[in-house]
Amino acid sequence: SRVGQHPYDSAHVILPEIMKDNGYTTGMFGKWAGGYEGSVSTPDKRGIDEYYGYVCQYQAHLYYPNFLNRYSKSKGDKEVVRITLEDNIQHPQHGEGYEKRTQYSADMIHQTALEWIDSQNGKQPFFGVFTYTLPHAELVQPEDSILQYYKEKFTEDKDWISPHWSRYNTSLHAHAQFAAMVTRLDTYVGEVLAKLKEKGFDKNTLVIFTSDNGPHMEGGADPDFFGHNAILRGTKRQTHEGGVRVPFIAWGPGMVPAGVVNDHQLAFYDLMPTFCELAGVEDYVAQYTNPNKEVDYFDGLSFAKTLTGKEGQQAHDFLYWEFEETDQVAVRMGDWKMVSKAGKPHLYDLSKDVHEDNDIA
């Protein structure tokens, strides 16, 4: 099935379920990549108390979609429901006329997330997952001051004209669009932090900002124009460092030492044990292992010690990646990185060759 549509296995617990089970109210805002509408794995069935965003992956690749999805007990929802964007559907979903749509999903999702933070009373702990998609293609957004700034800055820009087979709509001033989307996301993050401070939650809240992959090239995106990803080789869908190494920024006044750069190697499956440790969930593996399953996927290691500036951090023996669509596999052990393409191995010493140019296999 399409990536992001296949449901999470309901026999295996996921992080929001653990947090909810341990007294947290949970919210998620953005793209849900754990199951299609009506499947066994939608936000309402997986430990999420409040949800607003995309469950349909097709709509998730449009910023002026036909509909979004919502699950809100406070609004009387019994399950995930569709919220039709009435203004948008008055105009075509693709091609000429799409630019007349006005309901910009990224702004709508972000405002709902801010309202959710604002609704917290400070008595019950909260766990929020904000899966914003900016600056993923398609590269379109409102004609506001953010976009106008970059249109004036990039006087020689390019248009990306959508081919007939693409899911993405045409992007005019594609460089300006991409830069403005990054700035828009930065603005969102600033507003989230400001809301936490306004509510008095900033001294007792951990915020992590990260990404799911390296830069993409579709829909008019031009990573070469923007310096690619600095000294790293590769892009999204590749197992070179540029495809799998991503920004990871932690903010938590009084908890996370400020201004520290750390080279600890981690993967997203380390988030579950880390959050469990910080939330005081004891022996989560024993608690949440399914006795009816031969295998449970608790592969992570808590990096709470690294986050809080303490000694004794446990490290992975290795990290592993694969991407079946490009027939690429990679394994990293310390500074050694093996990348396999179509079965042929390539070996790099990242301590001397972070761009992965010198194959010593």
Label for each model-derived stretch:
Residues G34, G38, V55-M272, C276-Y297, ...:
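Active-site-proximal cap/lid insertion segments
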Residues Q5-Y8, K236-E241, K310, L319-E322, ...:
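Short Gly/Pro-enriched turn/cap motifs at secondary-structure boundaries
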Residues P16, W116-D118, D327-V339, H346-L347:
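Short, surface-exposed beta-strand/loop micro-motifs that present aromatic residues
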Residues S1-M28, E37-G38, P43-E50, A60, ...:
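Active-site segment of extracytoplasmic enzymes that catalyze sulfate/phosphate-ester chemistry
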